[in-house]
Amino acid sequence: MGKGQPKEPKIEQSVVDLCKRTVAMNLLQCYPTTTVDEMNCEEWGNGTESTQSVAACQGCIELRKEVTDLRQAVNLILPMLPLYPTIGNGFNATGLAAQPTLQHVIQQSLLRKRPVAQTPTVPQPECPGQIRPVLSSPAAALQNVIMLNPWIMGSSLKPASPTLPNGQIPTTIGETSLQGTDDQTVKWIGPSSVDSNGQKTDSSAASAGDNQNIDVIGDGSESPTSSNHSAQEIALMTSQQTFLNALKDSSFLFTNPVPTVETAPPLRVAPPINGTTNGTAKAGGPERKPRKPVNDDIVKIVRNQDLSEENISMFEIPVPKAIASDPTFRPVSEQQIIQQIIQGKKYEEMEVGECMIQLCKKLAEKRVFGPRLMSQTTVAGLNHSNYANLPIKGICYIQHVCRKVLYDKFENEEDFWDKFREAMRKLAARCRRVRHAKKTKHNREEAQAEMLSKRYGEDMPFNLNGAGLIRPKVETVSPEANILNSDQIKSQLESLFAHIPKTESETPLIEIIQQNISLFTHLIRTKVESQSPPLQGPQ
């Protein structure tokens, strides 16, 4: 170095290492404890200029403050840096378009102008050469932070704490723009270009953009320019808080946001007025009308009828519906059915309720209703069965016969009606059995007819006799067929014999006629047998 220039302070290796550790540890979010020996003023200067050493110590404090601001800004902004270019339109809508840009805020916070010393006797100390590259380029500082931050570069460096996540943010447009600014050279203006009164010399003429990169370490005195810095810090804090709120609301920082479940309000539809449905469509199909409740207690229905003997004697037994449903129904007399029940072997052993059940079944099936009508009806209300009830007059007649035959065996009137109610339940079960038997018989006949049609190759469901044999198919003779009678045969024979020449030994005519008649009879019989199928034996 020249003799006229100020002598460069002899910086010990420990102080250099301290500066390196200070910058590195600040960027790595951990501060080492600074001892008194490390902050000794004598180690910065040459021991002759105490004011310069004091200024150097103050410069270290300012440096730590700058690094602290940088660390806070980086910790708040860098995790959201990849998302910054994609949410610009959203912040314009919230009125934040006038906020300073990210690079401008970092440069102003990191490299803002400090007030120069007003005393001409105190020269400004030179910035240590070891940290000049870090402070000269904000993009380089950000790049170093990105490379040294274990939260951002989890795949390249081991995190300082086992609880820190190894997250990795992909490269986006924001990072590429910062990397592009690293290639640009930033000029450093040394303190030698500033004279003792704080004015720049002619040799250090630079542009307005270069003036932002001048970092003159002053004595820490405040000036009117600090108000701008305070306003920028307030704007930075406001933008950071708005940033966090916006990202929290937009769920950018949460990979699996928990959706809020919003229950739909219940749909309230006004009741229809004057037959209208208020815009709601009716379900397809016919409208179902509610059925009136039917009293299924047959005893109450019977007791509401006129049960006098004169009225019951006027009833037509069997009921007309029985004859209409089955014209071949032949009823059995009342006295015959009563004799079958009384003269039975188990009559004396059966209870009176069982006797009433047997009497009601036989009267209903063999005299009053018949099996065909019973298979189509039941003894219950419409709310218990899809079948109609048996005619009430027939049930009243059955009640009259049971009272005439078995009433002496009951203790009182209510006991009789209780047993009659049970007998009607059994009669309804009998109707179901008859219905099932009819279906089974019909299915059995259809199965037999189908089997025969498959065997003989033709459909003959109604060509069975009572024994199950196939009836022969009779073919009707067409009226055009020539049927020969005896007169026609005789006239044809006479005309035939008239042309026959007479011989000496003439045969009597009567013999010739008999022979020809027998021949023609044999021919006719053969023709009839060929037209009709042969009779088949029992299967």
UniProtKB/Swiss-Prot annotation:
Post-translation changes: Cleaved by caspase ced-3 in vitro.
Keywords: Developmental protein, DNA-binding, Nucleus, Transcription, Transcription regulation
UniProt KW Transcription keyword: yes
MF-aspect GO terms: double-stranded DNA binding; RNA polymerase II transcription regulatory region sequence-specific DNA binding; single-stranded DNA binding
Biological process terms in GO annotation: negative regulation of transcription by RNA polymerase II; neuron development; regulation of cell fate specification; regulation of development, heterochronic; regulation of nematode larval development, heterochronic
Localization terms from the record: Nucleus
Positions of region (Disordered): 162-230, 262-293
Domain of life the protein comes from: Eukaryota
Feature: compositional bias, Low complexity: 274-284
GO cellular component, one term: condensed nuclear chromosome
Region (Involved in sequence-specific DNA-binding): 296-440
Knockout consequences: Asynchrony between gonadal and vulval development. Retarded uterine uv1 cell differentiation. RNAi-mediated knockdown results in the precocious onset of tail tip retraction resulting in over-retracted and shortened adult male tails (also known as the Ore phenotype). RNAi-mediated knockdown in a ced-3 and ain-1 double mutant background reduces the percentage of animals with developmental defects including impaired egg-laying and production of ectopic seam cells. RNAi-mediated knockdown reduced the number of dauer animals in a dcap-1 mutant background.
Phenotype for residue 381 to D: In sa485; alteration of vulval-gonadal synchrony
Phenotype when changing residue 322 to T: In n838; decrease in protein levels
Tissue: High levels in hypodermal, intestinal, body wall muscle, nerve ring, and ventral nerve cord cells of embryos and L1 animals.
Ranges annotated as biased composition (Polar residues): 163-183, 193-214
Comment text on domains: Despite no sequence similarity in conventional searches, based on an AlphaFold predicted structure, the sequence-specific DNA-binding region exhibits structural homology to known BEN domains, for example in human BEND3 and fruit-fly protein insensitive insv.
Function statement: Heterochronic protein which controls the choice of stage specific cell fates. Involved in the temporal progression of vulval fate patterning, possibly by inhibiting lin-12. Acts as a transcription factor involved in the stage-specific repression of various genes, including insulin/insulin-like growth factor gene ins-33 and neuropeptide-encoding gene nlp-45. Binds to the consensus sequence 5'-[CT]GGA[AG]-3' in the regulatory elements of target genes. Plays a role in governing the developmental timing of male tail tip morphogenesis.
Full protein name: Protein lin-14
Recorded name of the encoding gene: lin-14
